[in-house]
Regions:
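N-terminal "mature-chain" segments and other terminal, solvent-exposed stretches
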Residues: 42-45, 53
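Beta-strand acidic-aromatic groove motif in beta-rich domains, primarily in extracellular
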Residues: 71-77
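Extracellular/periplasmic metallocenter environments
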Residues: 2-43, 69-71, 82-128
Length: 128
């Protein structure tokens, strides 16, 4: 009988831990914000000031909306951002409705269509 009582207690503890884990995971997901790059104008030229006044956290999602026949989005490093060049192996998005989850630190994005980045189609987003 004592063994049965102990078994029920252990089961309740496991259930409580599982519920707590679900609540914590849900809270983390609920904290993430979704931002549309360029707001209503979408991903376009001169969106490099779009980040002004916004606060980003690791796990937040950027949505890039654009004409996929004219533009793309490439995740680059600081050198790629500064030089408007996509290094080999860079992640290229081209659906016209791309979702990118921010990592902690500065995340850089450019359009790699010739001349577009140089014309201001690039952003750097710093996530805390």
């Amino acid at each position: 009988m004592a063994a049965q009582q102990q078994g029920r207690g252990s089961g309740a503890a496991v259930l409580a831990a599982a519920v707590l884990l679900c609540v914590l995971l849900h809270a983390h997901v609920a904290e993430s914000a979704v931002f549309t790059v360029g707001d209503r104008g979408g991903w376009s030229f001169n969106t490099n000031t779009w980040t002004n006044g916004k606060r980003f956290k690791a796990g937040d999602v950027l949505v890039f909306k654009y004409d996929s026949t004219a533009h793309n989005v490439v995740a680059v490093n600081a050198a790629g951002y500064k030089g408007c060049s996509a290094p080999g192996g860079a992640k290229v998005y081209k659906s016209g409705n791309d979702r990118v989850t921010l990592a902690r630190g500065t995340n850089y994005f450019i359009c790699s269509i010739p001349g577009h980045c140089q014309a201001g189609m690039k952003i750097g987003v710093t996530a805390a």
